[in-house]
């Protein structure tokens, strides 16, 4: 800024100390800096400071608070990431604790930008007070401020966390929403390393979370289960829950749901919790906590709409791994009955359930995600998945049934059906079924069908897979390979335009 602008800002700054009507002065400062180059404005603001602007927030008349925030925001925008906190540390501390929402939001945004850009911009020894102040804001009544505080306190350097975790205890004295915010920070920190998890345990947070599952607040319980499920996928997390007896206590709570008038609302959360663990440790969960499997299969068999979508997702998540498939088949008839029920749901349910059931089936049939590249598929899995697929329609031909579903014009159903078809075509027996069913190859190769982009890409991937198959004759393989070469979005119009452009 020119020396004239610098002097002008000094005059405005001085007037803020003496004038009673500060609104015109704040507007003048706003106009002065609004369009000034950042480099020039930064020098002036660094030299003169912002103390008098900040002081405008500390007067009895609060009518100018919003305008003061606007002015401070313009001033802060002239600085690089992290520089505002470095240049005006004491002011940021004051702003973080201000009673006005817009003021706290302004301050926490500056800390947020610094931490997200580069956590090392604010070294812990110098700025620990800032981090402590932000940690206390996870209880903030302004949801936006609280959410930013959660992100900041979850992404600091290691040496900040002992103090941050200590501060989270403040939230435990507040309402369930604030406690959930604190728990989220605790879990985010615990997932970073065993040492930090141990620190969370020593502070009593994990035990407190498990005990809070006895609350009558349904949403609160579900949030805790969601957070604990994230922790349980870590070996040290699940080991603690088992050794501490927490998993046993959570299992007992499932048994009590039938006597709880709100049990129907809670059951989906408990199923998701145990499914997240069973995805990684199916054998141990099936053996030690059979009540989970019983609840899962009962939920599928009952067809209860409040829990069925979650149950389908859970079964698919468990069965997507090879170990999960083998453990499920070892369960015997309850699982077979569940498979048959899912086949019925695919054939006869409304769109939402049909789609969830198709994706569940696809996860159970698929082997690609859990099989080494080009490696052989366990022959037991080949036999199991073939039998499971037949349950799609035992009274008719399962592959003809799938072809019919693939032809349904609704995009979401079609995409889910293609997901199942792709899973089926990961097996030799699946390729053979495609080759056997009249009209299936023609349907796949028909580019005249009006399909959304995602469906065209999904069908293209299936054809690309089948183009490497050994079960089709040379003519069909040639057509498959031509389709692959032309790409998923080729059409006669594309060819016509290309020819016209070449003339």
Locate each region found by the language model.
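Short, hydrophobic/charged alpha-helical patches characteristic of ARM/HEAT alpha-solenoid repeats
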Residues: 3-4, 39-48, 79-87, 120-128, ...
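Solenoidal tandem-repeat scaffolds enriched in leucines and small polar residues
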Residues: 101, 111-294, 304, 311, ...
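Residue-level detector of extended alpha-helical repeat arrays and alpha-solenoid scaffolds
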Residues: 22-25, 65, 104-105, 146, ...
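Eukaryotic tandem repeat interaction scaffolds
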Residues: 246, 252-413
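N-terminal "cap/leader" segments of large eukaryotic alpha-helical scaffolds
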Residues: 1-58, 165, 491-503
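HEAT/HEAT-like alpha-solenoid repeats
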Residues: 10-18, 50-58, 62, 89-97, ...
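Alpha-solenoid helical repeat scaffolds
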Residues: 70-71, 79-81, 109-110, 152-153, ...
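Hydrophobic residues within the alpha-helices of tandem HEAT/HEAT-like
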Residues: 29-36, 68-77, 110-118, 152-158, ...
């Amino acid at each position: 800024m020119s020396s004239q602008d610098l002097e002008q800002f000094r005059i405005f700054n001085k007037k803020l100390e003496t004038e009673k009507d500060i609104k015109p002065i704040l507007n003048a400062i706003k106009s002065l800096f609004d369009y000034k180059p950042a480099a020039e404005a930064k020098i002036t603001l660094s030299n003169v400071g912002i103390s008098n602007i900040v002081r405008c927030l500390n007067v009895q008349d609060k009518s100018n608070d919003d305008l003061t925030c606007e002015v401070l925001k313009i001033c802060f925008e002239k600085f690089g990431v992290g520089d505002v906190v470095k240049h005006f540390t004491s002011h940021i501390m004051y702003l973080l604790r201000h009673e006005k929402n817009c003021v706290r939001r302004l301050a926490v945004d500056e800390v947020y930008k610094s931490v997200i850009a580069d956590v090392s911009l604010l070294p812990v020894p110098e700025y620990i007070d800032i981090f402590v102040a932000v940690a206390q804001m996870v209880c903030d009544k302004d949801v936006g401020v609280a959410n930013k505080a959660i992100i900041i306190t979850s992404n600091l350097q290691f040496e900040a966390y002992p103090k941050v975790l200590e501060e989270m205890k403040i939230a435990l004295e507040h309402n369930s929403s604030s406690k959930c915010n604190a728990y989220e920070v605790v879990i985010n920190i615990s997932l970073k390393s065993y040492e930090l998890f141990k620190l969370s345990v020593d502070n009593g947070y994990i035990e407190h979370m498990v005990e809070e599952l006895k609350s009558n607040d349904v949403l609160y319980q579900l949030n805790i289960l969601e957070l604990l499920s994230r922790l349980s996928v870590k070996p040290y997390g699940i080991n603690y829950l088992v050794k501490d007896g927490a998993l046993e206590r959570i299992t007992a709570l499932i048994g009590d749901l039938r006597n709880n008038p709100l049990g129907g609302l809670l059951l989906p959360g408990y199923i998701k919790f145990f499914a997240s663990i069973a995805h990684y440790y199916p054998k141990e969960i099936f053996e030690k906590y059979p009540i989970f499997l019983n609840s899962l299969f009962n939920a599928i068999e009952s067809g209860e709409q409040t829990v069925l979508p979650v149950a389908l997702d859970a079964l698919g998540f468990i069965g997507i791994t090879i170990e999960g498939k083998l453990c499920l088949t070892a369960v015997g008839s309850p699982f077979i009955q569940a498979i048959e029920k899912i086949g019925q749901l695919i054939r006869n349910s409304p769109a939402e359930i049909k789609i969830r059931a198709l994706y569940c089936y696809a996860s159970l049939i698929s082997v690609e995600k859990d099989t080494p590249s080009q490696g052989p598929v366990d022959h037991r899995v080949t036999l199991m998945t073939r039998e499971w697929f037949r349950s799609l329609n035992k009274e008719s031909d399962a592959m003809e049934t799938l072809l019919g579903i693939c032809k349904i014009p609704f995009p979401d159903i079609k995409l889910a059906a293609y997901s199942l078809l792709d899973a089926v075509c990961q097996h030799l027996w699946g390729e053979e079924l495609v080759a056997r069913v009249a009209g299936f190859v023609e349907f796949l190769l028909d580019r005249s069908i009006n399909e959304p982009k995602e469906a065209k890409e999904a069908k293209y991937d299936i054809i690309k897979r089948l183009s490497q198959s050994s079960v089709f004759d040379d003519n069909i393989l040639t057509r498959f390979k031509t389709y692959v070469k032309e790409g998923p979005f080729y059409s006669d119009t594309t060819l016509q335009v290309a020819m016209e452009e070449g003339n």
